[in-house]
Every structure is written in C-alpha cells, then in structure tokens.
C-alpha cells in the first residue's frame, strides 16, 4: 500500500483540491491540523469524502475545545469551532495520535503530528540527536513521519528515517502557491504541488476568518523560507527544553 501523507491543510481548500488531483495512492493519511483555517467545513467534508485516515494535530484539539483568550490563534480556533457542527467536533475529539501503517517497501511507518510522544513537540531538520534520542525511546518503526512546522525535510537519525511531509495549506517553502506533501511507498517522495494562490486569496477574504489579511500577506503571498522557519522553531524548541 502506498500512502499520501497530507499534513497541515489548515482549511486551505484550493490547495487541498490541487493535491488530491495528483494523489495516486491507496491511502490518504491526514497528519493533523486539517481544519484550523479559512474553509474548515468544506476541507473536512472533502477529506472524509475521500475516505482519508486521520491523526490528531494540536490545532484539532484547540478547535474541538477552544480557549477564552484573545490571542490570534485562539480567536481563530473559536471561529472554526463555530463553523463546525457537533458531529464534526466529536470526530476531531476522537482522532488518534500517533498511528502506524504498513507501507509498501518501507514496512511499518509511524505517523505523528509533532513527535511520537506529543502532537505539538517540535522536530526540525537540524534538531540534534541529544534531543531526539529520548523522543524516540521505545519507537520500533524505522520510518517516522511528522509535520507541525510546515517545512519539509528527510533525514537520518542513526538508523531511523525522519520525514516531515510539509504543509498542504500553509507551506513554509519561501514560494507562494505551493502545497507540500509526501508520497510514501516504495520510496519517500517529498512532493510540491502548485495551486492558484490569487484565487485562494480572493476566497479567503470572503470567509470572515479572523485577521484574514495577516494570513494572506504573511503566509499565502509571502511565506517564509524553510531555513527561516527551521531556525525559528529550533530556537523555540531549545528554550522549551531548558
């Protein structure tokens, strides 16, 4: 079985549609954070229509039970919560994390959002082995796929292969109009699918999504590079581990 790993869609329906038009795999694995974005209901419906397998991301938890603060992402989580009905929210609450699947040519692969032990732990292309070793303690799979940071990578950690599938809806690859994902089986392919970002921007502006212009300007039209994001997240992870 081949697996298309679609992570961090973040309610970007046009990007998702472009990727699904390319997917040729027996299983679609949604790696968390599918709905926290401007078109959540339509995104979730399309993925479920395609009979995708889901795991939980940190934003799925936040949407299912949003906080009361006024921070930007908290307000966005509340807005998405209000767009979904109770059945959809219950679906998000019931998502597993992590999940292992048998993949053609790769054996048993472990899919997680942040790390095998947490849906919000940060792993990057430059995370040092001293921090990775305890994270992988007890993990038996030779291939682990993660997301969360929106920046693709494929690296070896000892004998284990660690892959970040990137982000379908908010790819931090330094180029607008790119949806990043991974195709697994029998090898690992980091894929980048173009989509119409200008049309997406027009749709986003009509949704009522909180601070939509910030999303448009800072993510959709002018996304940071993988190098910038990796340095930022690794610095944050180092501070959190102290």
Summary of predicted features, one role per range:
Residues 129-168, 179-181:
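Anionic-ligand binding region
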């Amino acid at each position: 079985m081949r697996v298309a790993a679609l992570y961090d869609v973040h309610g970007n329906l046009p990007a998702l549609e472009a990727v699904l038009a390319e997917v040729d795999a027996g299983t679609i694995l949604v790696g968390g954070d599918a709905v926290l974005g401007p078109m959540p209901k339509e995104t979730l419906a399309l993925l479920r229509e395609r009979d995708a397998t889901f795991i939980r991301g940190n934003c799925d938890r936040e949407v299912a039970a949003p906080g009361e603060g006024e921070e930007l992402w908290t307000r966005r989580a509340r807005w998405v919560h209000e767009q979904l009905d109770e059945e959809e929210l219950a679906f998000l609450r019931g998502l597993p994390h992590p999940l292992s699947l048998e993949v053609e040519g790769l054996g048993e692969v472990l899919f997680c959002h942040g790390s095998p032990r947490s849906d919000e732990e940060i792993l990057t292309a430059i995370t040092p082995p001293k921090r990775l070793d305890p994270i992988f303690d007890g993990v038996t799979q030779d291939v682990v796929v993660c997301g969360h940071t929106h920046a693709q990578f494929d690296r070896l950690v000892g004998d284990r292969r660690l892959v970040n599938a990137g982000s379908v809806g908010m790819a931090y690859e330094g180029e607008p109009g790119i949806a990043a994902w991974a195709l697994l089986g029998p090898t690992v392919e980091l894929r980048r699918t173009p989509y119409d970002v200008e049309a997406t921007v027009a749709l986003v502006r009509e949704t009522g999504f909180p601070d939509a212009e910030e999303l448009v300007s800072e993510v959709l039209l002018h996304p940071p590079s993988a190098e910038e994001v990796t340095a930022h997240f690794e610095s944050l992870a180092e501070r959190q581990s102290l």
